[in-house]
C-alpha cells in the first residue's frame, strides 16, 4: 500500500531495529523514522502491546538487558510525541473475528482491532503481509 502523512502506528519490529545495538541498514532506517517523532516533525501512535512485544523480543534475544529495555519503554511511554493506544476486554472478540476472517495471527488481529478502535488505519511494520485487512495501510519503511 501507499504511504500517507496520516497517523501511523509503529510496530514492534520497527522499535526492535531502532534500538538494537548492532549497526545495520534496517537500524538506520528505523532510527531515522523515529527521529521524525523525536524532533517533532511527525506524531506516531504506539500500543502497550507493541511495547510488551518489544521487551519480549529484545530481552529474549539478548539485544538489550532488562534494565535498558525497561528504561527505554519508560521514556517512550512518557514521551508526548507518541499517541498511546490500548485494547480492552471488548477488543478481544473483535480480534478473534479478524483472526477468523483474515487468517491472521491472534496478536496481529489484536493490534489491527486496537488500531481500528482508535481510528488509526496506517502502520509502519516490517511485516506488511501480516496486515492484509482492507482498512489497514501497511507500509514497510525498511525495504
Could you describe each region identified by the protein language model?
Residues 1-7, 112-143:
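Acidic, PIN/NYN-like endoribonuclease modules and their adjacent C-terminal/linker elements
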Residues 56-79:
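Helix-adjacent hinge/juxtasegments
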Residues 14, 50, 91, 110-111, ...:
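Alpha-helix capping/helix-boundary segments
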Residues 1-46, 63-71:
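Short, well-structured N-terminal submotif of metal-dependent ribonuclease cores
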Residues 40-44, 82-83, 119-122:
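Short active-site oxyanion
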Residues 10, 45-46, 86, 106, ...:
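Short beta-strand scaffold positions
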Amino acid at each position: 500500500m501507499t504511504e500517507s502523512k496520516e497517523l501511523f502506528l509503529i510496530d514492534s519490529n520497527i522499535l526492535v531495529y531502532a534500538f538494537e545495538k548492532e549497526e545495520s541498514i534496517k537500524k538506520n532506517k528505523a532510527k531515522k523514522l523515529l527521529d521524525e517523532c523525536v524532533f517533532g516533525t511527525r506524531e506516531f501512535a504506539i500500543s502497550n502491546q507493541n511495547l510488551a512485544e518489544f521487551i519480549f523480543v529484545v530481552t529474549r534475544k539478548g539485544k538489550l538487558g532488562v534494565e535498558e529495555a525497561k528504561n527505554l519503554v519508560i521514556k517512550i511511554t512518557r514521551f508526548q510525541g507518541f499517541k498511546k493506544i490500548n485494547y480492552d476486554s471488548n477488543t478481544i472478540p473483535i480480534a478473534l473475528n479478524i483472526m477468523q476472517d483474515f487468517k491472521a495471527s491472534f496478536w496481529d488481529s489484536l493490534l489491527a482491532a486496537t488500531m481500528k478502535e482508535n481510528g488509526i488505519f496506517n502502520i509502519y511494520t516490517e511485516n506488511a503481509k501480516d496486515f492484509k485487512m482492507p482498512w489497514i495501510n501497511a507500509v514497510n519503511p525498511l525495504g
